[in-house]
Regions:
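Active-site pocket scaffolds in enzymes
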Residues: 24-37, 108-208
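Histidine- and aromatic-rich segments of cupredoxin/plastocyanin-like copper-binding domains
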Residues: 1-103, 172-188
Length: 208
């Protein structure tokens, strides 16, 4: 089992893995219903990807670039498993959290700023709903176990990952269907992503 973690602050890594074959089994620590094949893996800041792989050669991790690749690392493989048993890759145990019900309310959080991002109402380079840096008061307050739909709107010229502390949420597909269960979603430039979250963990949590 191999876990990839993007610990960078703002770099999105498109990765290519060589020397292994297998499937993605979890995203941000939450098991997928069905393990997925992979070729290239895109991992945004704070995101995690878990794989179960069969190692056939030296593991090579390359970052894909416009004009080639940059080698991030290599893991040498030594010895041979003489008792190897071939079996299908099964799904990991599912989260005990049920899929949330219909939302009690719907909110919108708009990211603005940065180079080519245009003016906004904040007083720094970036803003969320026209507020820069930490607000004087929490953006919103929720009752325990309240289900909320949030539209994350990226009006900047760059893709941006949004990470919610203390909770996981469901990404919603364009048709409204429930997608992956994770705590960090990548939003493309001039794009948006709807998420559905049941706020069941009391506390003061950052969304960044």
């Amino acid at each position: 089992r191999l876990r990839l973690i993007n610990a960078a602050t703002n770099r999105i890594f498109p990765l290519k893995l060589s020397g292994v074959d297998g499937k993605i089994v979890a995203l941000d620590g939450m098991a997928l219903d069905t393990p997925r094949d992979f070729e290239d893996i895109f991992i945004a800041p704070a995101q995690r990807v878990d794989l179960i792989v069969d190692v056939s050669d030296k593991l090579i991790i390359d970052q894909l670039l416009r004009d080639g690749f940059f080698r991030l690392g290599e893991l040498p493989i030594e010895g041979e498993n003489l008792q190897r048993k071939v079996s299908p890759i099964d799904a990991l145990p599912k989260s005990s959290k049920p899929k949330p019900s219909s939302p009690n309310r719907e909110l919108e959080l708009v990211m603005m700023g940065g180079a080519m991002g245009g003016a906004h109402g904040g007083d720094n380079i970036w803003s969320l709903n026209n507020v820069s840096d930490m607000p004087a008061q929490p953006w919103e307050k929720f009752d325990k176990n309240e289900t909320v739909k949030i539209k994350l709107v990226n009006q900047t010229a760059f893709p941006h990952a949004m990470h919610l502390h203390g909770h996981h949420f469901y990404e919603l597909k364009d048709n409204g269907e429930v997608g992956d269960f994770r705590d960090t979603t990548l939003i493309g430039a001039r794009a948006s992503q709807d998420i559905l979250c049941c706020f069941d963990n009391p506390g003061t949590w950052m969304l960044q």
